[in-house]
A protein has these predicted regions:
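A short, compositionally biased
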Residues: 1, 32-36
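Short, extreme N-terminal segment that most often corresponds to the first beta-strand
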Residues: 1-16
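Non-catalytic effector/regulatory segments
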Residues: 3-4, 53, 77
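Histidine- and/or cysteine-centered catalytic micro-motif in compact active-site loops
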Residues: 9, 18, 42-44
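Short, surface-exposed beta-strand-loop junctions and turns on beta-sheet-rich folds
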Residues: 12, 21-22, 46, 70
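Charged, amphipathic alpha-helical segments
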Residues: 17-29
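Short, structured protein-protein interaction patches enriched in aromatics and acidic/basic residues
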Residues: 35-67, 71
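Mixed-charge, glycine-accented linear interaction segment located at domain edges/termini
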Residues: 69-117
Length: 117
């Protein structure tokens, strides 16, 4: 299982290597063109019920980490489908079979202290 790191959060998003390789091509192509879009998925078993979406934008840092040292064989048709779906209002939706995201960490809800006091 590969990992997508999005933004400064450092929260890993586990995605099967082959799916991540195809997603990487679609994402980098769109961002190189300056085109933003969403990538969404339903939470997998072991996570709180719900879904997540990422807003892909050229100014947000991304890192793709693959478990397999050999590059995946890419399917042009799958990449084209990802590109088409990225152009829709719903964006790219990942199938649960491609995900291994693990538990979603709790967000710290403590209020920020006011330094003026």
């Amino acid at each position: 299982v590969g990992t997508l790191y999005y933004g400064d959060s450092g929260t890993p998003i586990g995605i099967e290597d082959n799916a991540l390789a195809h997603l990487k091509v679609a994402i980098t192509t769109k961002l190189r063109r300056g085109e933003s879009f969403t990538v969404s998925w339903r939470h997998t078993e072991g996570q709180p019920r719900g879904r997540s979406s990422l807003w892909m934008h050229p100014s947000i840092p991304l890192r793709f980490v693959f478990d397999d040292p050999e590059p995946a064989d890419l399917d042009r048709g799958w990449i084209e489908e990802l590109m088409r779906s990225a152009n829709t209002a719903g964006g790219v939706t990942l199938d649960s079979e491609h995900l291994d995201t693990g538990p979603i960490p709790a967000i710290d809800t403590q209020p920020i202290a006011d330094d003026a006091e």
